[in-house]
UniProtKB/Swiss-Prot annotation:
Alpha(8)-beta(8). The alpha component is a flavoprotein, the beta component is a hemoprotein. It comes from Aliivibrio fischeri (strain ATCC 700601 / ES114). One of its GO terms (cellular component) is sulfite reductase complex (NADPH). Binds 1 siroheme per subunit. This is Sulfite reductase [NADPH] hemoprotein beta-component. The gene is cysI. HAMAP family: CysI (MF_01540).
Length: 576
């Protein structure tokens, strides 16, 4: 069957089978309204109906419960302690001190956990918001210029942007494009304002010129990247704009399409995949290309099997060149050959850096992104105290850290003093710890199969011990990530060592990613315990320490030494 006939078959729907039930749900939702208002008025249950459980995602929320107490509540004949997690829409992760103080106050007064969670989507999450407080939450955010539209669901999610305050002018341009792309691809329905902000119900017909009345087949993620930093992990995303500068001025973007990390255990038709390079476009074509990629995926994506609905599978099904050609046609552009660039690092530069504008920026390492007042380490209070005096802004990073940006020289010492007094600067944190990351998982995530956030700190301590045992210096560390399920929020499928939760206390153990985030790791051992994993790491690090080439990273070593095969083409190699 030729590619052209294949595409026609796909478009006619004959290849893919009956539509998934989510398509019915979206079609009947009256542009994402559903019966959410009625559910909010139902105080008999703390949860939402089956359909609205899905629909609230388009409004930036997930229904969850506290899994630590689920069994005990069941014994008492009580329903699970339903609550919602909200993820804010913050393109590029920039938030003002005034906004920060407002979200800090809400988290303290109206969430079950009293914490703020910085996430790999370069924004913050509230966890444990009970139904009576949901509308208040949205109205509080709206009062400070924040919303949560389309941070979940089958839409374009929060747009990430490289956090690079040193290159202040270029960063500002890239950040502005991240905001423009976010606004351009945002749902146009008034449902959010009507439901949460008591907006006037207008007698108008909603239209979604880009997303369509059934929205996208699956979630869609976009980034704006300033090389050589790859802090946003381009290959975890559907659409990436790599900033190309000429004499310090942004002139256009290289466009990468079709990355993504989610998969399903036991389903070899699912796999993590790197994005394909489509080529360069000038700035004035950016929004046209963004819309063309989204609408092509909207029309060609798999709406029958949600496990194969993401852009990466569409590219592999129709062919990358065919997809690219359709984007060119819809955008009225011809991709030029990509301009040279290199991605070399992913970590945040923890500590102080000075920008070319003479202002100072303090990157704070926040382990797992969890801002909470721990005994002896009141991290959440510390950031609030900084916000009370800070004259610049805060920048949340895709590594779950926080940058205090735009600090004038005369305020630098005072900001550092506050940070140190509250444990936000800890000189004992190793480079290994700073290069380790986990998703939330238990107790709040309903998809978690194993611990991640609560597991990581102590396990990293054990990895630190292994590195020390083999006499490896501080700079020789390993990109280590844990995700509680195969959906990939912790981006373990771009790590040198990636653990993917399989069952309580058990993980699939992946090796072979690289430090720059441009290679997918391969499964080394399946469904093994953390003790078995540590034993394996000890043996592997021992070999790395004695057999490696000069400056050879751990992931590169595991491939050269034949410990795992390199994943070059995911569809062919990942499960081979």
């Amino acid at each position: 069957m030729s590619e052209l006939i294949d595409v026609k078959t796909i478009l006619s729907g004959t290849e893919l089978g009956p539509l998934a039930d989510n398509e019915r749900l979206k079609r009947e939702s009256k542009y994402l309204r559903g019966t959410i208002v009625e559910d909010l008025q139902d105080r008999i249950t703390g949860g939402f109906t089956k359909d609205n459980f899905q629909l609230i995602r388009f409004h930036g929320m997930y229904q969850q419960d506290d899994r630590d107490i689920r069994a005990e509540r069941a014994k008492q004949k009580l329903e699970p302690l339903h609550n919602v997690m909200l993820r804010a829409r913050m393109p590029g992760g920039i938030i003002t001190p005034k906004q920060w103080l407002a979200i800090d106050k809400f988290a303290e007064e109206h969430t079950s956990y009293g914490s703020l969670r910085l996430t790999t989507r370069q924004t913050f999450q509230f966890h444990g918001v009970l139904k009576p407080n949901i509308k208040l939450m949205h109205q509080t955010l709206n009062s400070i210029g924040i919303d949560s539209i389309a941070t979940a669901g089958d839409v374009n999610r929060n747009v990430l942007c490289t956090t690079n305050p040193v290159e202040s002018e270029l960063h500002q341009e890239a950040y502005e494009w991240a905001k423009k792309i976010s606004e351009h691809l945002l749902p146009k329905t008034r449902a959010y304002a009507e439901i949460w902000l008591d907006g006037e119900k207008l007698e108008t017909t909603d239209e979604e010129p880009i997303l369509g009345s059934n929205y996208l087949p699956r979630k869609f993620k976009t980034t704006v990247v300033i090389p050589p930093q790859n802090d946003v992990d381009v290959h975890a995303n559907d659409l990436n704009f790599i900033a190309i500068a000429d004499n310090g001025k942004l002139v256009g973007f290289n466009v990468l399409v079709g990355g993504g990390l989610a998969m399903t255990h036991g389903d070899t038709a699912t796999y993590p995949r790197k994005a394909d390079d489509f080529g360069f476009v000038p700035l004035d074509k950016t929004l046209d290309v963004a819309a063309a990629v989204v609408t092509t995926q909207r029309d060609w994506g798999n709406r029958s099997n949600r496990k194969n609905a993401k852009t990466k599978y569409t590219l592999d099904r129709v062919g990358s060149d065919v997809f690219k050609g359709e984007v060119e046609k819809r955008a009225g552009v011809q991709f030029e050959k990509s301009r040279p660039y290199e991605l070399t690092e992913r970590g945040d530069r923890i500590g102080w850096v000075e920008g070319i504008d003479g202002k100072h920026h303090l990157a704070l390492f926040i382990e797992n992104g969890r801002l909470l007042d721990y005994p002896g380490k009141p991290l959440k209070t510390g950031v609030a105290e900084i916000a009370k005096v800070h004259q610049g802004d805060f920048r949340m990073t895709a590594n779950q850290n926080l940058i205090v940006a735009g600090v004038p020289s005369e305020q630098k010492d005072h900001i550092e003093q506050i940070a140190r007094a509250h444990g936000l600067i800890d000189d004992t944190h190793s480079e290994q710890r700073k290069n380790s990351m986990a998703c939330v998982a238990f107790p709040t995530c309903p998809l978690a199969m194993a611990e991640a956030e609560r597991f990581l700190p102590e396990f990293v301590t054990e990895i630190e011990g292994v590195l020390k045992k083999h006499n490896l210096p501080e700079e020789d560390n390993i990109i280590f990530r844990v995700t509680g399920c195969p959906n990939g929020c912790g981006r373990a499928m771009l790590a040198e060592i990636g653990l993917v939760g399989k069952a309580p206390g058990r993980y699939n153990f992946h090796l072979g990613g690289n430090r720059s985030g441009t290679r997918v790791p391969k499964m080394y051992k399946e469904n093994i315990t953390d003790r078995q994993i540590l034993t394996e790491i000890d043996q592997l690090v021992g070999r790395w320490a004695t057999e490696r080439n000069e400056n050879e990273g751990f992931g590169d070593f595991t491939i050269r030494a034949g410990i795992v095969d390199e994943v070059k083409v995911s569809k062919r190699d990942f499960h081979a």
